[in-house]
């Protein structure tokens, strides 16, 4: 079981790195830094000399080669692929366990899910950053992180905090988890549609609290297949609708989190309330900085990573609340 615990913990750390690399790739507009998959302009890594670059551009004349965009894409791909290799080892050791448990099935499910993530990685490139595909791919990254974390919790002999006596904790923690998933989806949808700066001021949006918004086109999940979606194709009102929804959802999520934290604070689980509070405050601050300072790269990456930490924190509360 120790092997499972170590591998799953390493998986959590590696998945965290992959999420950061994915955010980096997206934020520097390198999603099509390699227009093919799994190679890069037909090379195992990426073209480096003049002859290789000339060959690469002859293969894909519609995609001029830019090494500054190829590097983030290739690095992200190889780190993501290493998650699959790690999941293979995890599944192998899980099936060797003599104890009766279902960790082996969770490990196998994780391996299958990572293979599906690879497929979505291919579709992300082949469909030229189609927003719904990119959104599902990024959401899958958070799911991969959570699955590794769940296996880590199941494999470890951790001292549990008794939260069973906290009234209505199951319901409140479940609502908080679902609300956070919705907020993460809205954040990812904002990013994949290049709507992060649709509202360039705060707390207003384009100088008003009720800007012009187009929800129909902003939340059209079935955008046309074929066009290149790099930099986004939505008009301003549609992007504003996406961005503003993410802001309003953040307010609602904060209220739900405050209720959850109040339940945890007056119990033996007070440290969990403190953790949630610190992460929530950090995330709100990073979100505001992203708008006010026009999406600084490392702040925007941090915004993604704190979202991942919030997900693990709320998942931990649910794990304790629903644990038999």
Kindly give the residue locations of the regions a language model identified.
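Extracytosolic (periplasmic/ER-lumenal) interhelical loops and adjacent juxtamembrane/interface segments
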Residues: 30-72, 196-236
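Membrane-interface loop-to-helix entry segments
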Residues: 71-88, 132-144, 241-259, 300-309
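N-terminal signal-anchor transmembrane alpha helix
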Residues: 6-38, 179-190
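N-terminal membrane topogenic signal
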Residues: 1-10, 324
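Interfacial helix-loop-helix junctions of multi-pass membrane proteins
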Residues: 25-36, 115-138, 190-201, 239, ...
């Amino acid at each position: 079981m120790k092997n499972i615990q170590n591998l799953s913990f390493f998986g959590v750390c590696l998945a965290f790195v992959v999420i950061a690399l994915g955010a980096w790739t997206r934020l520097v507009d390198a999603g099509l830094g390699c227009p093919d998959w799994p190679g890069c302009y037909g090379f195992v890594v990426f073209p480096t000399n003049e002859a290789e670059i000339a060959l690469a551009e002859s293969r894909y004349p519609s995609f001029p080669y830019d090494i500054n965009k190829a590097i983030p894409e290739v690095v992200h791909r190889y780190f993501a692929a290493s998650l699959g290799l790690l999941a293979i080892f995890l599944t192998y050791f899980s099936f060797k366990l003599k104890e009766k448990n279902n960790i082996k099935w969770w490990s196998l499910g994780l391996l299958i899910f990572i293979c599906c993530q690879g497929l979505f990685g291919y579709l992300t490139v082949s469909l030229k950053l189609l927003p719904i595909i990119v959104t599902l791919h990024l959401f899958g990254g958070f799911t991969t992180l959570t699955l590794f974390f769940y296996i880590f919790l199941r494999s470890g002999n951790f001292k549990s905090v008794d939260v069973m006596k906290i009234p209505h904790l199951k319901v409140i923690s479940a609502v908080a988890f679902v609300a956070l998933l919705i907020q993460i989806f809205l954040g990812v949808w904002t990013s994949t549609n290049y709507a992060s700066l649709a509202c360039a001021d705060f707390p207003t949006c384009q100088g008003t609290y009720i800007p012009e918004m187009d929800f129909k086109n902003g939340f059209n999940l079935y955008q046309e297949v074929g066009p290149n979606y790099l930099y986004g194709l939505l008009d301003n009102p549609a992007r504003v609708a996406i961005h503003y929804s993410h802001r309003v959802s953040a307010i609602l999520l904060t209220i739900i989190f405050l209720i959850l934290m109040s339940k945890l604070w007056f119990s033996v689980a007070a440290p969990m309330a403190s953790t949630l509070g610190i992460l929530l405050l950090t995330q709100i601050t990073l979100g505001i900085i992203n708008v006010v300072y026009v999406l600084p790269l490392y702040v925007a990456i941090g915004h993604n990573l704190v979202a991942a930490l919030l997900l693990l924190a709320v998942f931990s509360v649910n794990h304790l609340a629903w644990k038999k």
